[in-house]
Amino acid sequence: MLVGQGAGPLGPAVVTAAVVLLLSGVGPAHGSEDIVVGCGGFVKSDVEINYSLIEIKLYTKHGTLKYQTDCAPNNGYFMIPLYDKGDFILKIEPPLGWSFEPTTVELHVDGVSDICTKGGDINFVFTGFSVNGKVLSKGQPLGPAGVQVSLRNTGTEAKIQSTVTQPGGKFAFFKVLPGDYEILATHPTWALKEASTTVRVTNSNANAASPLIVAGYNVSGSVRSDGEPMKGVKFLLFSSLVTKEDVLGCNVSPVPGFQPQDESLVYLCYTVSREDGSFSFYSLPSGGYTVIPFYRGERITFDVAPSRLDFTVEHDSLKIEPVFHVMGFSVTGRVLNGPEGDGVPEAVVTLNNQIKVKTKADGSFRLENITTGTYTIHAQKEHLYFETVTIKIAPNTPQLADIVATGFSVCGQISIIRFPDTVKQMNKYKVVLSSQDKDKSLVTVETDAHGSFCFKANPGTYKVQVMVPEAETRAGLTLKPQTFPLTVTDRPVMDVAFVQFLASVSGKVSCLDTCGDLLVTLQSLSRQGEKRSLQLSGKVNAMTFTFDNVLPGKYKISIMHEDWCWKNKSLEVEVLEDDVSAVEFRQTGYMLRCSLSHAITLEFYQDGNGRENVGIYNLSKGVNRFCLSKPGVYKVTPRSCHRFEQAFYTYDTSSPSILTLTAIRHHVLGTITTDKMMDVTVTIKSSIDSEPALVLGPLKSVQELRREQQLAEIEARRQEREKNGNEEGEERMTKPPVQEMVDELQGPFSYDFSYWARSGEKITVTPSSKELLFYPPSMEAVVSGESCPGKLIEIHGKAGLFLEGQIHPELEGVEIVISEKGASSPLITVFTDDKGAYSVGPLHSDLEYTVTSQKEGYVLTAVEGTIGDFKAYALAGVSFEIKAEDDQPLPGVLLSLSGGLFRSNLLTQDNGILTFSNLSPGQYYFKPMMKEFRFEPSSQMIEVQEGQNLKITITGYRTAYSCYGTVSSLNGEPEQGVAMEAVGQNDCSIYGEDTVTDEEGKFRLRGLLPGCVYHVQLKAEGNDHIERALPHHRVIEVGNNDIDDVNIIVFRQINQFDLSGNVITSSEYLPTLWVKLYKSENLDNPIQTVSLGQSLFFHFPPLLRDGENYVVLLDSTLPRSQYDYILPQVSFTAVGYHKHITLIFNPTRKLPEQDIAQGSYIALPLTLLVLLAGYNHDKLIPLLLQLTSRLQGVGALGQAASDNSGPEDAKRQAKKQKTRRT
């Protein structure tokens, strides 16, 4: 099948990607030769719509997204590539609210007769837009559900569609064609303020001209007393957001005797409970409300619970819960901080240790639902103390006596910044509170782990003191103040603070010049290990320093600067009760240390002091030290055939350091000799990656330099003669000057160059010239660096051949390929310049070359009578170059190009280029497609003018990856037609891919997303011939690469029985062993025989799973005359799928007992014959020999019979033996 439909022939020079492709179950293991079929069609509409907003998506029948694409904006054409056979669902996904028929199409792609393979169109027809609107609650952005909304043509009464609003008040009508419509809303109970609106539908979804409005919702509730309904209870409604005008069916007059507790509430109206205890507000707009019950008797107002209820009316009717209940009466009281003091806010008042209320900002509180009786009242407030009171409460005592605070907290904090290291740190201290009244006793508390403490104190004057242990005082721990005076009046005292006293030690450093960075240390002499450092830095000759938070004691102060000399490097000070100052360190000189890697000559002098201080030193390798008494900048210049890190080194006494001179480069010389004087350039590349290539030149030959020097000398002598002639007079000038000649430039010419190389560096020297070729083309040299390398490079140059040509007419960018005659690969490829010309060279003049040219969209022919000139003929069309993000050509991309009646779907080949020629003028829409890639641009409309050739570059970015693997049986045979799937896990559970194995058992699961974990497994359907898989699934995590070697073994649902086994024996017996398989009713003829060879394991070809009985017998060729052994055998039934058998073979070598027995039979006769031999030796010796010969013959026959009896005897034995069943 040809994937691609197009109008017009392809030009002769156009490289196209139209190929014949067959749809198969799976693509190759790797590469771009994947099999693709296109599935496309049109989105059609009788009204104008924006096709670019519509997406077409391909799903598996289980709902997994396989591919998605958009439509051509000019005609609605779409194309989707398919890589696998199977069942799919094609869905159109337009903007929300657009309707199409059909919305889905089921596909059964078999590669033969389906609509995609046959190139048919799948069309989706537009049926209408959506109309959207809202029914809102008055003054709210949302509205209710359940309002009936109808759509009808303007000016008619017939309903076209009806619907019900959803939560939030939204409603929508679908499949509405362009036109003018009216929308009406109705509800059986709610009052509608705006019940109708209009809408105009043109070429997109439309919204109602204005929202429909619900005026309000009914709210109801009930009140009871001891389970009976209560009539006449007033329910007052308040709201800070809703006005009285918006409330319907409610009495707006004020309620006599009601005093609101919360002045911020805005009164709206009230309603009264009916005989059944129910009350209701007819119509309340959406918003927040507060309802307060009010029930007044003859002399007292009774409490109703809850006393206040906040509720919110949203977008529906509301029944107030819970039910209101009439309770007892209420009393009030106050909590004060003194007899005539202020109210205490947020105090907790407890009634009989059960009922708890909190005081307001003025200290008042209210107890509700109280009945007559005697109560115990107690108040609580942090840092305040109250006494418990007992009082009798009745309806005639609505106001309680004031509860007055009797004591307050005195709290503070102990802050210790540094604890002495010589004593164990204490977490808690004792603090004493003593009253100025001498009759009162002391109060002692202990701090917590953080140093905080609190006392309870009645009003009065006090002082607080911390008890510090004597050991800590001796170690230097001191707190300030020693005592803290305070006065308690009518509130807690919370600011008592004791802070540790620490001293400071300060001084200055005097330097000969700028001090720079210095380190000053402070070390305790009495407490080992206590040492502190202070880093100083400044560009002045004097600096100060200060050590803060110093405990009392003796200390040693030192200054650290190894490269400077000091009057005193350390001083001792003692800290008592005051800060220590006036510590001074004074610098007296500098020290210079110089480290050399080679024995060299150094020029050493100080800047700014004249040439009299210049010194030249021949120094050897090592470290040299210099003592400097003056500050300043010193300059050190090395002189050597080695180059150092710097041409000269500067030592600044204000920044002392070890001056290290390390040779990093060494002088390498080279010469290039040529037979013609030309431009010669040398490129030197280093083996060191960080070293950039050095280009020298164009170089001047030694002959040129010598000639220039001679000319300069002749000119100098001429000027000298003119000067002398003017001094000696006219007579001398009349003599003709001597004519001086310079040497003629004659070859060979020598070009000298040099390079500074590093130790161990390998350099590659490559000369170049416009007309010369060099032999060798480049040279390598390695520099040791121990001594001056000298001349290491010598190269010779010869003139080369040049090939030039021209494109007619002038055409830029034509690819010119130069090849050696007969060579299979090109030698040089260049492109013509903006004038259509090119030049290639130098080339070896002793070779022959061929020149070819090509350019996409052009036909190029050689100009007769020229070498290298070509004529160019332009072709009209569009050329697409599709590359990956690494700028490499991207093959296998399906490019869809459509416009007017033209449609074409082609695949890119290895060069990533597609060219469409002879296109008609007009607009075209292109879209590249390939699974696992996204493209920029993803699609685009282009305008093709007559005779125009467009070149468009498309870049593909990898967004997903593939999983490659194989499915095989247990014996390694590939399994074809197995349905595989990759199921996303965790956050990727919505993703999945599937495919089918090919004839080699290979599969490729495409489109796996990076960062996702998948289970690769057999699909539940389509694998009826497979019983199970091993493993059940493979877990893969997709990164930024394809995943290979995901292999799965399957077991078929077939009538097959696998038989395998192993033999336990010594490896020396393996070559003698055979495993034979018999049917149990025929042990004479084995049906299969397997030789072990060198393996302990064996495997028979599959048997039928027929339930028959079989016997496995181990046979051996070991001679039984030398070994004793038992041949094991096992019987089994061919039920199930597999049987593994273990056979044990342990032969033992026989001892020579048989030879001894035969010798004993003839020992006695022989002995007698020997005794008689002396008497009748002439008669007995022949007889003895004859007897011995016969006895040996009998023994040999017996042995031969024993050796030949093994296998047959084993069979007979097997028939007689009782077999072991497993």
UniProtKB/Swiss-Prot annotation:
Residues 1213-1222 have a biased composition (Basic residues). It is a single-pass type I membrane protein. PANTHER family: BOS COMPLEX SUBUNIT NOMO1-RELATED, CARBOXYPEPTIDASE REGULATORY REGION-CONTAINING. The keyword Transmembrane helix applies. Residues 1177-1222 are cytoplasmic. Residues 1-31 form the signal peptide. It comes from the Eukaryota. GO terms for cellular component: endoplasmic reticulum membrane; multi-pass translocon complex. This is BOS complex subunit NOMO3. It comes from Homo sapiens. Residues 1198-1222 are annotated as: Disordered. Glycans are attached at residues 50, 218, 618. SUPFAM superfamilies: Carboxypeptidase regulatory domain-like (SSF49464), Starch-binding domain-like (SSF49452). InterPro entries: Carb-bd-like_fold, CarboxyPept-like_regulatory, Ig-like_fold, NOMO-like_N, NOMO1-3_2nd, NOMO1-like_9th, NOMO_12th, NOMO_3rd. It holds the Pfam family NOMO1-like_2nd.
